[in-house]
Amino acid sequence: MLKSYLSITKPGIIFGNLISVAAGFFLAAKSEPASLMLFLTTLAGVGLVIASGCVVNNIFDRDIDQKMARTQNRETVKGNINIDVAFVYALAMLLLGTALLFQLVNPLSAVVVLLGYVYYVFFYTMWYKRNSVYGTLVGSISGAVPPLVGYLAVTNFISLEAILLFTMFCLWQMPHSYAIAMFRMQDYREAGIPVLPVKDGIHKAHRHMKAYVVAFGAVSLGLFLLGEAGYEYLAVAAVVCLMWTKVTFRSIDESNYVVWSKSVFKVSLLVVMGISGVLGVELIPLAL
């Protein structure tokens, strides 16, 4: 039973998002005082709110999850979870996570994470994901909130650097998510989810992905140009962005787009891990 309730929080998604929270935190802590306790409290608060959002997503997506091979074995689909209990579970995590951030971090981080939550649950999950080709774009905005909250946990102020970080992660989400949609195209078709590759075809999606990858690379260099990240960051960012660009710009057709999209997806993970990791390695000694 405990395993079932843990699974609907999507631990993998939580872990991935907390890496970006850490990146935002250490980027801000380069020039602002921070502590290990503040760092751990931020991770706990954001992690609980993300877990709550994932549970609500599982609850509301039961009808489409049962149509997709990837999700048809989720506990909420199989009926192993009491939906009323799951709602209470999600609400408890949301309240606890927000309270931790509000009381022990700062009110701004709590407000921003709550706005991201509302955006994800009400705008993305309940409407845009199901009804609009722009669902991925809407989802990318909420997906870029965790690193922003990590940054705000330290600074308690939305600066140009914070906006740049938020923009970076918004741009990263788009080709990453389109790649998933392309190699799981049949699932999305059967569930009736109008993602760009399904609605407008793989070639239009490919053009969009190339544009987003180039934009991400340009924006990611902004942290170095602003003097907020050093040469180690520049080297890693340049390498992973060039790798992502090279893979994304390959020609595709109906015979190879699945293999290609899996490659784009894998490199996208390397990109976010590399950039988040180098920010941590470069800035941890200055932060804590």
Swiss-Prot record:
Q: Do the record's keywords include Cell inner membrane?
A: yes
Query: How does it sit in the bilayer?
Result: Multi-pass membrane protein
GO terms for biological process?
heme O biosynthetic process
Q: In which pathway does it act?
A: Porphyrin-containing compound metabolism; heme O biosynthesis; heme O from protoheme: step 1/1
Task: Identify the InterPro entries for this entry.
Answer: Protohaem_IX_farnesylTrfase, UbiA_prenyltransferase, UbiA_prenylTrfase_CS, UbiA_sf
Principal location listed in the UniProt entry: membrane
Q: Which domain of life is it from?
A: Bacteria
Q: Where in the cell is it found?
A: Cell inner membrane
Question: What is the reaction catalyzed?
Answer: heme b + (2E,6E)-farnesyl diphosphate + H2O = Fe(II)-heme o + diphosphate
Q: What is its EC number?
A: 2.5.1.141
Keywords attached to this entry: Cell inner membrane, Cell membrane, Heme biosynthesis, Membrane, Transferase, Transmembrane, Transmembrane helix
The name on file for this protein is Protoheme IX farnesyltransferase 2
